[in-house]
Structure formats: C-alpha cells, structure tokens
Amino acid sequence: MKKLLLIGVLALTMGQASAQRCLPKMQGIEVNAGFVDGKPMSAAFCGGAALSTYTKNGSKWVFGGEYLQRDYGYAETTIPVAQFTAEGGYYQKLLTDGSKTLFVYGGVSALAGYESVNWGETLLDDGARLTDKDSFLYGGAVTLNIEVYLSDRLALTGNVRERCLWGNDTGHFHTQYGVGLKLIIN
C-alpha cells in the first residue's frame, strides 16, 4: 500500500518543478536593436551585444558594446552622428514570477566610447563647416530591462534606457527603446 501511495504522489507531482534560471555564474549572450529618442528607425537607431553573468540573488553583471546613430537634418541632407560605446554595469532583479519565466531588472552602467560627427568630414556639400568634432565620450546609463524566457536557454528581452554622456558637442541625453534575444551559454 505504501508503494502504491508513493507512486501516486510522484505521478501527481511530475512536471511541477520550476526551471532553473538565473543561477549564480550562469552566463548569457544578448543581441539587441532599437530606436532612439522616439525618432523613426530610419533617423535614429541602436544595436549592441552584451554578456550577462548572474549573481546568487538573480541579479546580473552586464558587459557589452553598443552602436548608436542619430541623423540630424540640414538643408536637403542629413548629418549622421554615431556613437560607439562600451558598457559595464549591474542590474538588480526587481520582480519575477513563480515559474521564473518573467524577470524585471533595474540597472546602472558606466559607459565610455567615441562619437563621430559626419564621419569626420567637417566641410558640407554647400560649403558650410561643422563646428562639432569627433570626440571621446564618458558617462552612464539607467536601464529598465525585462526578460521573458521562451525556453530554458532562450529569452526575449526588452529595455528602456536613458544614456547621459559627456565629452561631446551634440547632446548629452539619449533615450533608447529596444528588443533583443538572449542565449544562455552555460
């Protein structure tokens, strides 16, 4: 009778185990893309890749690189401003569901990189000269990040982020909205 009861209990609890996600030292590679400052993607876009390493409380360290381009209108043409940045930051887990399918993070990051205005060309087609120059950037970002796990190794991500960078002539603040895919590698 005890064996029958044990088999019955085991049969009823099969499939009830939660997924083991965001365990300490797990790592994931993320690729993302988005738009900047509420402009259409043809005028302002960003993309990047990052490596996340999870800590014991489900939070994560993030290290990555990003490309951001915003086109500014001038007469009949546009002037591209491109930023290449490296990021290092900590994202604190704010919320998760019981099945560990949805995670919400808030994070802060340090950023450093380079900004190119019109790819270094200061003379425009109509003879005007740009006073903004290429420069090195430094600053930080505040991020709200969401991960929705599609399987144990694949997650859909979304983020909203505000970047604040100094050292440039073209504006300090940029708001980014993006989506991405994350692959857990170990």
Task: Label the model's feature ranges.
Residues 4, 21-29, 57-61, 100-106, ...:
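Outer-envelope beta-barrel architecture signal
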Residues 34-37, 73-79, 126-132, 164-168:
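Extracellular loop and loop/strand-boundary signature of outer-membrane beta-barrel proteins
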Residues 52-125, 183-186:
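Gram-negative (and chloroplast) outer-membrane scaffold detector with strong preference
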Residues 25-27, 41-47, 78-86, 102, ...:
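Residues that define the transmembrane beta-barrel architecture of outer-membrane proteins
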Residues 68-70, 145-186:
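Predominantly the C-terminal beta-signal and adjacent terminal strand-loop region
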Residues 19-70, 182-186:
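Short glycine/proline- and aromatic-enriched beta-strand/turn motifs that initiate or cap beta-hairpins
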Residues 1-25, 186:
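Cleavable N-terminal export/targeting peptides
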Residues 47-51, 86-88, 142-144, 148, ...:
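Membrane-embedded beta-strands of outer-membrane beta-barrel proteins
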